[in-house]
């Protein structure tokens, strides 16, 4: 609530948790305003309290809205500090009238934390996912799964990763931090075999389903930390890779993972980065251990901000085996 007691939705002011009221951000889906206004109106009419971070009281913490750029499908997910939404049927009546809404659900987060999402999803109405296309690949997107928010630039980003991978149809590829298989399934169309690794179980469930939906049979997926799965597979099964693709979160790659990549000696490493500082750190390690940065491209995913996605192609050079023992 604002200082006058009115329920508001908006964004955090920079480096604070003070909310600036806003329901019609031009960067979001055009339906956001209608959805947020209906949620706020329902809360006021049904006396549903917004969450207060200071006291840990109140029910509605966040409203997650996702839209399929191609399919126009809309997901509305209320993040709640509890396990039950009062008078939820009245909320459904309001939201299902908005064109495109195909999925309404709740995410349970009862922890006193600033982490947005909890682990439990409660379906309320419609599907528990939406679908979208990137290129000619159809993806199922669940509320807990990572999916890029700028679909136009995402296609360019993944297209650049595919170009740098240099696939001819004979390669074995490992895609680390694969999410719902967005890059993996792009690569699988040109590779002999693709293996994806992701720590979030619902994302891997989506990845497997996405492979099935698209008739892609040369992609396998593993749940777990990339820095644990790949070293284990290499040490116990001596798995091979012609190309390794990494698309880590802002913290970059764990050194145990980088060490295994160097030991596996893929011909090419494609590094997709959302943080230039950790990219520089990881490139320093890889180039010190026999890899050469050959090509680099930046993709402006968030115009008018300081953030940029970077794609780097590294090729295998001479390696000092003493350094990687």
Regions found by a protein language model. Give the residues of each.
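Flexible, glycine-/basic-rich loop-and-beta segments that form/coincide
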Residues: 5, 17-21, 317-325
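A generic beta-sheet turn/junction motif
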Residues: 4, 15, 69-71, 134
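Rossmann-like S-adenosyl-L-methionine
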Residues: 87-93, 97-98, 102-325
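Composition-driven low-complexity segments enriched in polar/acidic and proline residues
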Residues: 1-3, 65-66
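Short, aliphatic-rich beta-strand segments
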Residues: 65, 72-81, 138-142, 243
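Short edge beta-strands and adjacent turn/loop segments
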Residues: 57-70
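Internal alpha/beta scaffold segment
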Residues: 19-59, 82-108
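Short, acidic/hydrophobic/Gly-rich beta-strand patch recurrent on exposed beta strands
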Residues: 10-13, 77-79, 207
């Amino acid at each position: 609530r604002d200082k006058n007691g009115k329920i508001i939705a908006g964004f955090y002011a920079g480096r604070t948790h003070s909310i600036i009221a806003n329901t019609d951000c031009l960067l979001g889906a055009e339906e956001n305003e209608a959805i947020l206004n209906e949620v706020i109106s329902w809360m006021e009419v049904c006396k549903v309290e917004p969450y207060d971070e200071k006291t840990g009281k109140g029910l509605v913490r966040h409203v997650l809205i996702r839209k399929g750029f191609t399919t126009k499908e809309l997901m509305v997910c209320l993040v709640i500090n509890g396990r039950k939404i009062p008078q939820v049927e009245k909320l459904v009546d309001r939201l299902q009238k908005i064109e495109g809404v195909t999925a309404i659900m709740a995410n349970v987060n009862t922890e006193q934390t600033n982490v947005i999402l909890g682990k439990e999803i409660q379906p309320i109405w419609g599907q528990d996912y939406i679908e979208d296309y990137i290129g000619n690949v159809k993806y199922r997107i669940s509320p807990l799964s990572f999916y890029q928010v700028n679909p136009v630039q995402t296609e360019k980003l993944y297209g650049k990763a595919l170009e740098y991978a240099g696939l001819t149809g004979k390669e074995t590829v490992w895609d680390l931090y694969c999410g719902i298989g967005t890059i993996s399934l792009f690569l699988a169309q040109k590779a002999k075999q693709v293996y994806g690794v992701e720590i979030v179980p619902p994302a891997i469930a989506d990845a497997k389903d996405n492979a099935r939906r698209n008739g892609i049979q040369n992609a396998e997926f593993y749940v777990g930390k990339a820095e644990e799965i790949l070293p284990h597979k290499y040490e116990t099964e001596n798995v091979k890779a012609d190309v390794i693709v990494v698309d880590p979160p802002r913290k970059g790659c764990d050194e145990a993972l980088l060490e295994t990549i160097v030991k596996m000696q893929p011909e090419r490493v494609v590094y997709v980065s959302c943080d230039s500082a950790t990219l520089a750190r990881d490139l320093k390690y890889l180039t010190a251990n026999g890899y050469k940065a050959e090509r680099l491209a930046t993709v402006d995913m968030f115009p008018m901000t300081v953030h940029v996605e970077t794609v780097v192609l590294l090729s295998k050079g001479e390696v000092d085996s003493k350094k990687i023992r």
